Amino acid sequence: MSTAPSQQHASAQVPDPRGRFGDFGGRFVPETLTRALDELSEEYEKAKRDPEFQRELDGLLKTFVGRPSPLYHAKRLSSAVGGAQIWLKREDLNHTGAHKINNTIGQALLTLRMGKTRVIAETGAGQHGVASATACAHFGLPCTVYMGAEDIRRQKPNVFSMKLLGANISAVESGSRTLRDAVNEAMRDWMSSVEDTHYIIGSVIGPHPFPMMVRDFQSVIGRETREQCRDTFGRLPDCVVACVGGGSNAAGMFYPFVEDEGVRMVGVEAGGRSATPGDHASPLSYGNPGVLHGSYSYVMQDEDGQTCDVHSMSAGLDYPGVGPEHSYWKDTKRVDYIDCRDDEALTAFERLASSEGILAALETSHAVAKAIEIAGKMSDQEHLVICLSGRGDKDSMEIARLRGEEW
């Protein structure tokens, strides 16, 4: 299989029927999961054509999630930066405090359509775990969330919220005890329970149809942003910025703009402590194509093809792979991918808090940091939108620890 960058232009008409985004994506799974994935693909295609499914989903997004989320003009930050007008797409104001609920509500509805009676999920920062537990509580479905032991330490508020919502938390002690290991354990569970269980994957990763399906559920972010920009300042933005771990908030924001060539899109990965392998989580910046969790995409791996350990202070970006559509956008040069160090993200967290009164998630703060740099090189007649993917309440204790302060 070729790993050379594609020369084609990025298209919104992906994936193909095999789940391929150019060279990327596909389905690399044991035979055990093939039937479950075929069933999911078939049911999702039926749901997309079912007006009643869309009406129910739209109704829940409005009355339960609280959509549309606002597009907020960060005037003080814009003035201080002295460049482009900075706008925040406020996904942090959704029910549960992040974009993750857009996807879990959709997949929970599919769970019911398929007649499944149990849900499993993985989580890193805990936001997908909370969103999964919330959706399951709403629909009366039992939920087990797999979470790395290190992430449980970093994200105690979200762990407690999941328990209050009735979810069973399964701590993963293997490997680096982070998101990658949580996905591994969730996959193992699913292989032994496919008859009655649906796995709500939380990002645009995994085997087909998950990358497409999660992107579609999250694309409400970009669709609203397009409409809000036109209503607010009369045209599309000049630049859109989002953080990228697995990449669901970025995919949801970017996808509706893919064919708008005048809109620059920038994805920001976790640069961690340094560019040294093991010190960051930036597969699009430093990785190579390979297979991880059932999909072919850019991955942090060694010369033998073994997945490398990665690092980010933000649990939600601490992942060695990325969604295949992001790999496709990278190789077609439709999206620019850059990385942001831990210290830069922490500074941006503090700057947004003090200038706008908004506590952004540490994941989101990576996007804020680089958006500030980009905006500073633009004119004050231009407009830049940041996908503010989640709120930072969950990170309070970890930020206190990073700053050496008592909690």
Curated annotation (Swiss-Prot):
At the top level, the lineage of the source is Bacteria
Q: Keywords, A to Z?
A: Amino-acid biosynthesis, Aromatic amino acid biosynthesis, Lyase, Pyridoxal phosphate, Tryptophan biosynthesis
Which GO cellular component terms are attached?
A: cytoplasm
What reaction gets catalysed by this protein? Answer: (1S,2R)-1-C-(indol-3-yl)glycerol 3-phosphate + L-serine = D-glyceraldehyde 3-phosphate + L-tryptophan + H2O
Q: Which GO terms describe its biological process?
A: L-tryptophan biosynthetic process
Concerning InterPro entries, the annotation shows: Trp_synth_b_CS, Trp_synth_beta, Trp_synth_beta/beta-like, TrpB-like_PALP, TrpB-like_PALP_sf
Residues where N6-(pyridoxal phosphate)lysine is found: 100
Q: Which cofactor does it need?
A: pyridoxal 5'-phosphate
Biological pathway: Amino-acid biosynthesis; L-tryptophan biosynthesis; L-tryptophan from chorismate: step 5/5
Q: What family does the entry list?
A: Belongs to the TrpB family.
Say which enzyme class the record assigns: lyase
Name of the featured protein: Tryptophan synthase beta chain
Which HAMAP family does this UniProt record tie to the protein? Trp_synth_beta
Q: Name one Pfam family in it.
A: PALP
Q: Which CDD domains match?
A: Trp-synth_B
Provide ranges: composition bias, Polar residues. Answer: 1-11
State how it assembles: Tetramer of two alpha and two beta chains.
Function, in words = The beta subunit is responsible for the synthesis of L-tryptophan from indole and L-serine.
What PANTHER family does the database record attribute to this sequence?
A: TRYPTOPHAN SYNTHASE (PTHR48077:SF3), TRYPTOPHAN SYNTHASE-RELATED (PTHR48077)
Q: Which Gene Ontology terms cover its molecular function?
A: tryptophan synthase activity
Q: Where is this region: Disordered?
A: 1-25
Q: What is its EC number?
A: 4.2.1.20
